[in-house]
């Protein structure tokens, strides 16, 4: 059954609009990427222990990006802003100190959550902590 002329016309208008804006939307969605690594990825020792996370945000063109760290325990972090005058990368770092007699073992992660202009996230930087008893 053929479509009515008015339906065909609106279908073509919608398709043309989508094709017109698709390059701008895809370029904006992929301007930034991030990665983090945990050091040490596996901690065993006297607690509390500190895990250091380092990495970078990479831009494919000039622009502003807003992001925050997200953690496996759900603790919030403030939104941060980086300005890129040109394509390139900027270093990132944060720490997480944890482990106690009430939490002697923990497996977790931290990732970068982009807030603006895109909303994707990095792969998580995984780690684990195993507290040992302090020698007397």
Please state what every model-predicted region is.
Residues 1, 17, 84-87:
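A signal for specific C-terminal beta-sheet/loop modules enriched in small/flexible residues
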Residues 12-22:
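Bacterial N-terminal signal peptides
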Residues 2-14:
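Bacterial N-terminal signal peptides that target proteins for export
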Residues 27-136:
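Extended, solvent-exposed regions of the mature portions of secreted/cell-surface glycoproteins
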């Amino acid at each position: 059954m053929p479509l009515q002329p008015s339906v065909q016309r609106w279908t073509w208008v919608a398709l043309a609009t989508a094709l017109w804006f698709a390059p701008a939307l895809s370029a904006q969605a992929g301007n930034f990427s991030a990665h983090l690594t945990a050091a040490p990825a596996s901690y065993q020792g006297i607690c509390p222990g500190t895990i250091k996370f380092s990495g970078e945000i990479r831009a494919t063109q000039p622009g502003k990006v807003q992001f925050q760290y997200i953690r496996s325990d759900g603790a919030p972090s403030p939104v941060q802003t980086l300005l890129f005058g040109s394509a390139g990368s900027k270093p990132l770092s944060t720490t997480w100190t944890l482990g106690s007699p009430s939490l002697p073992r923990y497996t977790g992660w931290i990732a970068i959550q982009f807030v603006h202009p895109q909303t994707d996230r990095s792969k998580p930087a995984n780690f684990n902590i195993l507290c040992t008893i302090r020698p007397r």
